[in-house]
């Protein structure tokens, strides 16, 4: 079975697949223009968030039997179409959950204590203690939109910090230690709102101007899920008006952003989609990718 690894993947995982008898080629920097001429020769492929597998590409790959996404979301793959064509589509939903959850908590702490502003002030050789009075997370209400693997990990950590945790997720009936509420209830009650949902058409623009109006004044927003879930213009307006006190973003509508005005706001913390970028998560992702492909090849 021939596998093309299109994005950076741990070499231990690649060697594990080869040791199991798979023929594995790596083209970590393959371009969208090259894919239609290269991928048709392969039975399977491994992708991360960079490489997109869309219908036109699937149509020119008659040998393709399996696509494995190293990560959580499948929005970079036309998964339903692939399955209609008899292609198995898999991901690694739990491998990076802890890393994304820890980044989310880190973002909340930075927002609560204005650490990003305090650090910038010190680098400008200013000693301005009185300017950076913050808030404790304990006793605050955290609203989690999406109580799947990552959402549950965030909830567990937030509870240990003494936060009251509520969640909105129409896909589950219960989550340990979390009170499930409607979206409107969450928007009205939360001091911090964090997003952990995929981005199919149903969640695109899920938080827009109308939703921001329902939130508490001074709410803080964290998005480590997908950029399209929040309407950028609505978030920008809420941040500049003071409705939203601060936001922390790891994901964007376009990556890298085409418009940087949101990123440049003083009350926005930002990172270049590093939620899963820990050594531990990358090792788990690679191992799970290898195990899934080896198991598939043995069927």
Q: What are the language-model segments listed below?
A:
Residues 1-90, 186-188, 208-210, 214:
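An N-terminal-biased, well-structured beta-alpha scaffold segment characteristic
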Residues 2-4, 9-12, 22-26, 94-99, ...:
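Structural/interface elements that position substrates and couple domains in central-metabolism enzymes
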Residues 27-28, 48, 70-71, 87-98, ...:
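Short beta->alpha connector loops at strand-helix junctions that form conserved
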Residues 51-58, 164, 170-261, 277:
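Rossmann-like adenosine-cofactor binding region
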Residues 64, 138-141, 209, 218:
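Phosphate-coordination loops involved in phosphoryl transfer and adenosine-cofactor binding
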Residues 83, 90-103, 133, 246, ...:
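C-terminal helix-to-coil terminal segments
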Residues 85-87, 93-141, 153-156, 160, ...:
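Phosphate-binding beta-alpha-beta segment of Rossmann-like dinucleotide-binding domains, i.e.
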Residues 147-148:
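Glycine-rich Rossmann-fold phosphate-binding loop(s) that bind the pyrophosphate
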